[in-house]
């Protein structure tokens, strides 16, 4: 479960905190991108990895759990999870889980090393290209809205960085999904 903060100790910034989010220890908004845990795990080549969001795509979530369970080796499922530290109505969590995928900040994918033995690409990108703006997602959450209210120039600069990061990540993931294997 990735809440993008240290939820169990009060919502402090972690290496999973996205650009522009205000948290404890990042009061002016996190200025750098989050660590891509999935890419790190995929780099080993023998780890099953999936990134999921139940609110965005339940069939993909179920498929990832089934594949991970059947894989004879280490498996890692990174699941988007809303958190009280995000500053949203908790009944809207699944909607935010869809919004984060729709804007491209949380691509859904599966990496199954077994496919390599079949001559197939092990990386499957399960998300469509982003269909909404990052602002549509971010400014529904207090952790982003409060920076916009307190420091609009900084918020705008970090939003631009977040957009650049999404574009770069999408190019990289699309390359991984489309490359010949």
Indicate where each model-derived feature is located.
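A short, terminal or domain-edge coil/loop segment
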Residues: 26, 53-55, 131, 135, ...
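Glycine/aspartate-rich loop-and-adjacent alpha/beta segment that forms the canonical ThDP
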Residues: 58-154, 161, 174-176
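Thiamine diphosphate
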Residues: 1-76, 82-84, 88-103, 146, ...
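Generic preference for well-ordered secondary structure
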Residues: 21, 25, 33, 48-49, ...
